[in-house]
Amino acid sequence: MLGRGPTSLCKTEVLVYKTKTIKREIYHIIIPMILENILQISANLVTTAMVGRLLANDIAAQGICVRITDTLWVFYKGVAIGATVLIAKAYGTGKKEDCRKIMEQTLLTELILVFVFQVVLFFRADIFLGFFSKDAEILMLAQNYMKIIVFGFSGCVIMTVATAAFQGYGDTKTPMMVAAAMNLVNIIFGFGLIFGFGPLKGMGIFGAATALVLAQTFGAGMDLFLLYRKKKGLFFGTDPQKKWFYIDKSCIYEVYT
């Protein structure tokens, strides 16, 4: 029986080494992505946990609002995934200006859409909330809660699209850290605004909504800083769009389809 020669053994060792290296790199990308998604979703879960110490109607009102906001988040995330693919493709071919263009076009169109959602839910949230409850008191609490959290929709969109940009560049850790910081802000402000702190009286469910909006705004601001800061920003060295409010139909078509 003929044994394997030195050359064959070397090839096998190299193949095993490459396989291990590839697996390690995949884990380094996937694990932060999973954690980032968990942290994004957990912002509402943390709020729910804190609201859980309040009255039953408060819990119910917050719960039915979360059903709507989570549905919208799935939409934002779906569009962002399309942007991530295109950004990664452009980055792989060295077209960093295109990366910035794709991100900014996606952000612009999503902000336009989210503005429509904000207006509708601010003035007529009862149309949608009525599907989940018929209790007048719960619906009133839910409508007032919704009127506050709609102001955080823009921050949520900015964070989602910024995550698409970072992940398209192969950086999955930065969005995870931003999401973790957002949750920390939500917890700190949540306890203070819900239950009160010192001379500050607790605002109950509306304190929870305010804390969530503050946390999402903080996260959005942090993302924008990391994208556009001088010298170290993700888009440093790239030229901005000539017209910010110009919509490139072909670019948007690729993202949304």
Regions found by a protein language model. Give the residues of each.
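Short alpha-helical transmembrane segments in multi-pass integral membrane proteins
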Residues: M1-M33, I87-S154, L200-Y256
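Residue-level signal for short hydrophobic patches within transmembrane helices
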Residues: K23-S42, V46, I68-F75, F151, ...
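Transmembrane alpha-helix boundary and packing residues in multipass membrane permease domains
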Residues: M33, N37, T48-A49, V66, ...
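Helix-terminus/linker motif at the lipid-water interface of multi-pass membrane proteins
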Residues: S42-A61, L129-A136, G192-M203, Y256
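Small-residue-rich hydrophobic transmembrane alpha-helices
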Residues: T48, I59-V119, C156-P175
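Small-residue hotspots at the loop-to-helix junctions and early N-terminal turns
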Residues: A56-R67, A142, M146, A209
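Hydrophobic transmembrane alpha-helices of multi-pass small-molecule transporters
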Residues: T71-V74, N186-G190, A220-L224
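Alpha-helical transmembrane segments of multi-pass membrane transporters/permeases
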Residues: E110, A165-G192, F206-A209, V213
